[in-house]
Amino acid sequence: MKLTCVMIVAVLFLTAWTLVMADDSNNGLANLFSKLRDEMEDPEGSKLEKKDCQEKWDYCPVPFLGSRYCCDGFICPSFFCA
């Protein structure tokens, strides 16, 4: 009986997880790959090349020592630029 309940809960959890994580737009992966290809063809359009620092509330890998990752005027007190 316990095993049956555990299996039912596991199936429900995995079903819910799949529905939550599913991309609801049509042809989502194709759109993603076409955007990435366009950025590779046009390096000026790439956001990564334009931005060398992290903006406010962006992740910084090393707190207290990671202020060099944040843009000017921001510090990294707890894994996020503030």
Curated annotation (Swiss-Prot):
Q: Which GO terms describe its cellular component?
A: extracellular region
Key word Plastid present in the record?
no
Which residues does the record list as Alanine amide (modified residue)? A82
Q: List the disulfide bonds.
A: C53-C71, C60-C76, C70-C81
List the Gene Ontology MF annotations in alphabetical order.
calcium channel regulator activity; ion channel inhibitor activity; toxin activity
Pro-region residues? Answer: 20-51
Does this UniProt record's set of keywords contain Signal?
yes
Q: Where is the signal peptide?
A: 1-19
Keyword set, alphabetical order:
Amidation, Calcium channel impairing toxin, Disulfide bond, Ion channel impairing toxin, Knottin, Secreted, Signal, Toxin, Voltage-gated calcium channel impairing toxin
In which tissues is this gene expressed?
Expressed by the venom duct.
Q: Name one Pfam family in it.
A: Conotoxin
Recorded hits in PROSITE patterns, A to Z, give: OMEGA_CONOTOXIN (PS60004)
Matching SUPFAM superfamilies: omega toxin-like
Give its localization: Secreted
Q: What is its main location?
A: secreted
Protein family:
Belongs to the O1 superfamily.
Described function: Omega-conotoxins act at presynaptic membranes, they bind and block voltage-gated calcium channels (Cav).
User: Can you quote the domain comment?
Assistant: The presence of a 'disulfide through disulfide knot' structurally defines this protein as a knottin.
Q: What is this protein called?
A: Conotoxin Tx6.6
- From which source organism is this entry? Conus textile
